From Swiss-Prot:
Residues that coordinate or bind Mg(2+): 522, 524, 526
Name of the molecule in the record: DNA-directed RNA polymerase subunit beta'
Entry function: DNA-dependent RNA polymerase catalyzes the transcription of DNA into RNA using the four ribonucleoside triphosphates as substrates.
Positions annotated to bind Zn(2+) 2: 903, 979, 986, 989
Database matches in HAMAP family: RNApol_bact_RpoC
Enzyme class: transferase
Phylogenetic placement of the source organism: Bacteria, Bacillati, Mycoplasmatota, Mycoplasmoidales, Mycoplasmoidaceae
EC annotation from Swiss-Prot or TrEMBL: 2.7.7.6
Cofactor binding description: Binds 1 Mg(2+) ion per subunit.
Native organism: Malacoplasma penetrans (strain HF-2) (Mycoplasma penetrans)
Origin superkingdom: Bacteria
Pfam family, one: RNA_pol_Rpb1_5
Cofactor requirement: Mg(2+); Zn(2+)
Subunit text: The RNAP catalytic core consists of 2 alpha, 1 beta, 1 beta' and 1 omega subunit. When a sigma factor is associated with the core the holoenzyme is formed, which can initiate transcription.
Keyword terms of this UniProt record: DNA-directed RNA polymerase, Magnesium, Metal-binding, Nucleotidyltransferase, Transcription, Transferase, Zinc
Length: 1288
């Protein structure tokens, strides 16, 4: 612990020794009683005893002798209770001394992790279980050597199963025969009796049902041979006590060194044993501590008894477990005192073992303890794991005070950093601050004054009655702190933003329309939550970082996220339309004010093309002086933009005006207007580009310019969408009559396919594919026709077309369905599906030929509604799957924080264009991939030798274009995949932050941002295997979300979609049919050293031809590559590039752009572990899995020192399910999945968690080690005050 700040800096977990438990305990619990049913006070020595756990009431003992704080620390002579606060009942523990040793269930059970006792003793876990549960005996000592050894040390004597029972009996009889043959009967009477006993045992053991206790036989054999047999946890305890860990470690290590193959089962088990023994050796945990001699009784307030109405009580399940343990323990003590026969004794011990097992882990027992309602009781393990467990319910997420929620409505009158909060909500949320102002005795300058009310009660009354005196105070109080707004589901960081509250009437929260995209909110009944930041630091952080007006660009792609939508787009589109021959065309205005006046007098139309001198815009740059030819609307729009910004006239070239837009003085500008090419209006895309320009030019100069300009654009958008009076009507739908000719053709084709199929010339799969493909192309053709149709001049003023063209609402697909045809509908593909078929039939092959305007027939309506409903269920399924994936991504990357400026690595990732090798289409161009990265070496022009991009300097958009234009197709750049930083990554390897276009700041939690950027668009990915351009490829390869899951979880593709890959570099020497099987092709790949034959099913699509060159990992057949196979064949670099390419393919096919570097962050976490093959002179052991940077560091030391051999290792790749549990933190891992396994391993290891990630620190209530968590509080508050002054 860090004493200065009382901040916990690391935590260790381990096995508790019996002495340690007694040291923690405040007393032994010996009675199973809880509370007295009459007085309701805790019973003495019971599970709630005040003497052990502390007083029930603050500073009051049980008998009432001492009351009040003045006796603090005193212990009552009468009842033994310490006088202190009652909160200690949440901290103090007791213990139960067990009458017999008990094995801990986490250490004996095989699942979810290999049984630790089994690994240490090298006895199978089933045998351990049989010994612990008193089924079988185990040999503890082989004897004195006078007799031949019939039983080996640690051998389990199985008497339960028929087969092994027979073997055991014959071994026992053999031993007994040796004994009675060695006895000299003549020597004494005693010998004769012993001989007789041995004979009797010998004869009786021939039968399967024995009339005596087997223990008598063991005791008899023991007295002669010195052999000892044990049963129960006591026997295991003795074995664990006597084990020599150092000797075991050396033996296993030698065996591992000699073993050839590290992947066979025997070697894997040896590695697991070595690991367990090394953990115990290094952690100072003793193996015998895995067997319990006493158990902790948890604090009573964590397992309360609660009184319900009607005098009934309800209690935590944990109490039932403890009661059972205490009852059985006390009974066992009595049985031992009374010297009961061993069969009764063992039975009692077994019952106690089961009771303790149930307390620790009830669910994993074969027959769990059930409650009254026949459900299994919740044991300590269940209290930890899952969504309702301690980690996720209580430690990582808590419910928050000072919060409210309500429905949201649009607030077009708000500024971008404002939110309208209903009065009733403000009165509740800001109540303590309002009361403080009401009872305050000093004014803001510090002078004394009379308070408005004298006490809190009166203040509350004023608030309740909404007295007039409180309004000035409320207005003052709400200015002091912003509020946080959150909309669930919070898929990325923009799901929570800060706003300055404004009082509004009604009960709904008013939300600024521009932030709806970031929240993914709409106004159809969505609700949002409001939270109030309390501390000065939280207020300052909300203002400096979370305030809505700073979030201009989205983190996933660096594109504007506050682009105007819907009405605002429509208004701006209408405003910037250009039409010839409108009222007022050709008028010349002296300045903007004159133009506005004439427009308000309705002498000129908003679409009219007019002239205005360039001198009317003194601060703007023009290519030349003269008369600017533009429209009234565009002048109005440019008037709200910053004065220095260039004049926006042509949406195709916003950055600069062309000479044609300006007519020199003295020339006839009116004739020019009549001949002028009419520019298009500003669409949503144009507005997005304007935001980009604004952000690029002004975000450094002054923070408030961009948001205030956006507010003005929003205002004129709403104003002119109202003025445009755009409406929607059935008569606006374009008329289209061409489709019948396509239908006739395609119907003939479909009939033809049917005939071919009936004659056996086509398979059903081929027929289906061709039919679906034919109808898809008809729909595409109809779609193209309608697209041409609505571009005709007569449709340019059509309301629906305006909405679609502007990007406000609707697209070409809606038009196709409205006036063309609905086309093909999807169906669920396991409906009537033969499993053998390679084609997923997820489309109804009869299309809907009618359009909505014509109306659908009954069968069409049915198919249509079937498809629509499937869409709805898919969306619901997708949302939950995508949410789970985001959680896994966050867990895998939560400790990736930018911790350093430069790790000085000399290795990088080679970037080249990502293209679909099959179709040759570019998925992501090299320009896009290069922007915002640092090259490792100078990028030099191949011809002129000019340095285009110096090493270590950022590549801008212009430089990236230069590099590509120079014909360079590969550039090695810095990448997080090769960052040498041990904790987190460095600034240079990541490059620039997409939201600021500057170098990423130190302490940014880039891992979480990466996870959110990939997870957030996950819901937009399709669930169905969609077909690009009809049905392109014959096979159905998982696409969309399923493909993403395959890549990140490292799931091998299914047999039919798996691609066969080459293992060597060489040439395809031949492709022939197999002589044994005509359905199989044999592809032979040859090089100078070897040749390999690959068997390929006849119906697979080949990717190679004879004579093609292949590399290791090249595809031989079409499909998805198994990543683990690729890793073996081609190495980690190829695998990393393959995953980046495939993930980008999934997203970009859906039109979603994500920066490469986020995918790299995820891949870094999945591929940053290696497994030791040979330890050399290092401290690693063979088979150990370690972090790649640790491995590199250790090897660098070994290479620099003389005569030392470095270790060798192979790269591993883990899926998202495993990656979080491989991080250094057991707390983060345990709070993710497999809680039991991770905590068990950590205990045996004695693992130390140094709290480097975010989750671990949240659990301990520390500030997280990123962002402002690394700054001082004074700095944060100062920044907050600066920001407050900036608000416009």
């Amino acid at each position: 612990m860090n004493s200065k700040s009382s901040r916990i800096t690391s935590i260790q977990i381990g096995l508790a020794s019996p002495e340690k438990i007694r040291e923690w305990s405040n007393g032994e619990v010996t009675k199973s009683e809880t509370i007295n049913y009459k007085s309701l006070k805790p019973e003495k020595d019971g599970l709630f005893d005040e003497a052990i756990f502390g007083p029930v009431k603050d500073y009051e003992c049980a008998c009432g002798k001492y009351k009040k704080i003045k006796f603090r620390g005193k212990i009552c002579e009468k009842c033994g209770v310490e006088i202190t606060e009652s909160i200690v009942r949440r901290e103090r523990v007791g213990h139960i001394e067990l009458a017999a040793p008990i094995a801990h269930i986490w250490m004996t059970k095989e699942l979810p992790c290999p049984s630790k006792i089994s690994l240490v003793l090298d006895i199978s876990y089933k045998e351990i279980e049989q010994v612990v549960y008193f089924v079988n005996y185990i040999v503890l000592d082989e004897g004195n050597g006078k007799f031949p050894k019939n039983f080996n040390f640690k051998e389990v004597i199985d008497l339960s199963s028929q087969k092994s029972s027979k073997e055991t009996r014959s071994k026992l009889r053999k031993t007994l025969r040796e004994i009675y043959e060695s006895i000299d009967v003549e020597a004494s009477m005693e010998n004769a009796i012993k001989h007789k006993i041995a004979r009797t045992f010998y004869d009786t053991l021939a039968e399967s049902n024995m009339p005596f206790s087997i223990e008598e036989v063991f005791n008899f054999i023991s007295s002669f041979t010195g052999m000892r047999f044990g049963i129960g946890a006591e026997a295991i305890l003795e074995l664990l006590k006597n084990i020599d860990l150092d000797k075991e470690y050396k033996d296993i290590y030698e065996k591992l060194r000699k073993s050839e193959n590290t992947s066979d089962i025997k070697t894997k088990k040896l590695v697991r044993r070595l690991e367990a023994i090394k953990w115990l050796k290094d952690s100072n945990n003793k193996p015998e501590w895995m067997i319990l001699k006493n158990i902790v009784v948890t604090p009573p307030d964590t397992r309360p008894i609660i009184q319900l109405e009607g005098g009934k009580f309800t209690t935590s399940d944990i109490n039932s477990f403890y009661r059972k343990i205490i009852i059985r323990n006390e009974r066992l003590k009595r049985v031992i005192q009374n010297n009961a026969p061993s069969i009764i004794l063992n039975n009692e011990k077994r019952l106690l073992q089961e009771a303790v097992d149930a307390l620790f882990d009830n669910a994993s027992r074969k027959k769990p303890l059930l409650g009254k309602d026949k459900r299994p009781l919740k044991s300590l393990s269940e209290h930890l794991k899952g969504k309702q467990g301690l980690f996720r319910q209580n430690l990582l997420g808590k419910r928050v005070d000072y919060s409210g929620r309500s429905v949201i409505v649009i607030g077009p009158e708000l500024k971008m950093y404002q939110v309208g909060i209903p009065v009733s909500m403000i009165l509740k949320l800001f109540k303590p601050f309002i009361i403080h102002e009401l009872i305050k005795k000093t004014d803001d300058e510090g002078n004394t004054k009379d308070p408005i009310v004298s006490n809190i009660k009166s203040a509350e009354k004023l608030i309740l009655n909404q007295d007039n005196t409180i309004w000035p105070i409320i207005n003052k109080v709400i200015k002091q702190r912003p509020v946080l707004l959150n909309r669930a589901p919070t898929l990325h960081r923009l799901g929570i933003q800060a706003f300055e509250p404004i009082l509004v009437e009604g009960k709904a929260i008013r939300l600024h329309p521009l932030v709806t995209t970031a929240f993914n909110a709409d106004f159809d009944g969505d609700q949002m939550a409001v939270h109030v930041p309390l501390s000065p630091e939280a207020v300052a952080e909300a203002r400096t970082i979370i305030l809505a007006s700073w979030h201009i660009l989205g983190p996933k792609d660096g594109k504007p996220i506050i682009t105007p939508t819907q009405d605002m787009v429509l208004g701006n589109y209408y405003l910037t339309m250009e039409k010839l021959n409108m009222p007022g065309q050709g008028m010349l205005f002296a300045n903007v004010d004159e133009l506005k006046t004439v427009y308000q007098m309705k002498k000129v139309h908003v679409h009219s093309i007019i002239g205005i001198p360039t001198s009317a815009f003194p601060k703007k740059q023009f290519p030349k002086d003269g008369i600017l030819i533009t429209t009234v609307g565009k002048v109005i729009l440019n008037d709200v933009l910053p004065e220095e910004m260039s004049y926006l006239n042509n949406p195709d070239n916003l950055e600069e005006l062309s000479d044609n837009d300006i007519v020199e003085w003295g020339k006839d500008y009116r004739t020019f207007i009549e001949k002028k090419k009419v520019y298009k209006a500003f669409t949503k895309k144009t507005l997005s580009e304007i935001v980009n320009i604004l952000h690029r030019k002004y975000s450094d100069a002054s923070l408030e310019i961009v948001p205030s300009t956006m507010d003005k654009i929003k205002d004129i958008g709403f104003e002119y969408s109202t003025k445009s009076a755009t409406t929607i009507s059935a008569f606006d739908v374009p008329e289209y009559t061409e489709k019948e000719k396509y239908f006739e053709e395609t119907d003939k084709k479909v009939e033809e396919m049917k005939k071919y199929y009936q004659k056996g010339l086509l398979t059903d799969d081929e027929r289906y594919k061709k039919v679906v493909s034919a109808w898809s192309s008809v729909t595409n053709q109809v779609s193209k026709d309608i697209e041409k149709l609505i571009q005709k001049p007569e449709y340019l003023t059509n309301s629906i077309v305006i909405m679609a063209n502007s990007g406000a609402r609707g697209n070409i697909s809606n038009f196709t369905q409205l006036s063309g045809m609905r086309g093909l509908m999807s169906k669920s593909y396991n409906y009537d599906q033969k499993q053998k078929s390679k084609v997923i039939k997820d489309t109804i092959e009869v299309p809907i030929k009618n359009s909505f305007i014509e109306g659908l027939t009954v069968s069409e309506y049915f198919n249509s509604s079937y498809g629509a409903r499937k869409g709805m269920t898919d969306t619901a399924m997708k949302t939950s799957k995508s949410g789970y994936m985001t959680r896994k991504l966050v867990d895998a990357t939560q400790d990736v924080i930018v911790n350093n400026e430069d790790c000085k690595t000399k290795k990088g990732t080679i970037l080249e264009v990502i293209e679909d090798t099959k179709s040759g289409s570019v998925i992501e161009s090299l320009n896009e991939r290069l922007i915002n990265r640092f090259p490792i070496f100078d990028v030099v022009h191949p011809k002129s030798k000019k340095v285009l991009a110096p090493a270590g300097e950022i590549i801008t958009k212009a430089v990236a274009n230069e590099i590509v234009d120079a014909g360079i197709d590969k550039v090695e750049v810095r990448s997080v995949l090769h960052c040498k930083e041990e904790n987190g990554i460095c600034q240079k390897c990541f490059g620039t932050d997409l939201t600021t276009n500057k170098l990423v700041e130190k302490y940014t939690a880039i891992g979480v941002i990466a996870a959110q950027s990939i997870g957030e668009p996950g819901t937009q990915l399709t669930m169905r295997t969609f077909h690009t351009g009809g049905v392109s490829s014959g096979t159905n390869i998982a696409q969309g979300f399923e493909r993403l899951k395959q890549l990140f979880d490292i799931i091998p593709p299914k047999q039919w979609e798996k691609s066969i890959i080459s293992e060597i570099e060489g040439k395809v020497s031949s492709i022939k049919a197999s002589p044994d099987n005509p359905n199989i092709l044999v592809v032979t790949i040859k090089n100078s050293k070897e040749s390999i034959n690959y068997k390929v099913p006849f119906d697979s699509e080949l990717r190679v031809e004879e004579g093609d060159k292949v590399k290791p990992g090249s595809k031989i057949t079409e499909g998805s590559i198994d990543v683990k196979e690729l890793l073996k064949v081609a190495g980690i670099e190829v695998v990393r590039n393959y995953i980046i390419k495939e993930v980008q393919k999934v997203y970009r096919l859906q039109g979603i752009e994500i920066a490469d570097k986020y995918i790299e962050v995820i891949i870094r976490q999945l591929t940053n572990k290696v497994q030791i093959q040979d330890s050399g002179n290092s401290d690693f052991f063979i088979g150990q899995i370690i972090d790649i940077n640790t491995f590199r560091k250790e090897n660098e030391k070994l290479i620099l020192s003389d005569d030392k051999v470095p270790a060798t290792a192979v790269n591993l790749i883990f899926g998202l399910d495993e990656a979080p549990s491989k991080t250094g933190s057991f707390l983060a891992a345990a709070s993710f999945q497999d809680t039991k396994k991770i905590l068990t391993d950590a205990c045996v290891k004695g693992q130390i968690d140094s709290l480097n990630g975010l989750k671990e620190n949240v659990i301990f209530g520390n500030l997280i080690p990123c962002g402002t968590g690394k700054k001082s509080n004074e700095d944060i508050i100062e920044e907050g005050n600066k920001m407050y002054e900036l608000e416009y």
